[in-house]
Amino acid sequence: MDDFKQAILLLVVDFVFVIILLLVLTFVVPRLQQSSTINTGLRTV
């Protein structure tokens, strides 16, 4: 049972890690796109 619990814990930890990564990506990517568009706008000007 201990091995079983450890396996479940590993699965849960991986699952949470992936969710956090996805959340961070969804928050960071739009900001990066905004900053990149601002940078290109400054370069053209």
Swiss-Prot record:
Annotated S-S bridges: none
Domain of life the protein comes from: Viruses
Places the protein is found: Host rough endoplasmic reticulum membrane
Keywords from the UniProt entry: Host endoplasmic reticulum, Host membrane, Membrane, Transmembrane, Transmembrane helix
Extent of the signal sequence: none
Any single Gene Ontology cellular-component annotation: membrane
Transmembrane segment boundaries: 8-28
Membrane topology: Single-pass type III membrane protein
Function: Transports viral genome to neighboring plant cells directly through plasmosdesmata, without any budding. The movement protein allows efficient cell to cell propagation, by bypassing the host cell wall barrier. Two movement proteins, p6, Hsp70h and three structural proteins, CP, CPm, and P64 are essential for cell-cell movement. Also plays a role in virion formation. Together with CPm and p64, encapsidates the 5'-terminal portion of the viral genome.
Record's protein name: Movement protein p5
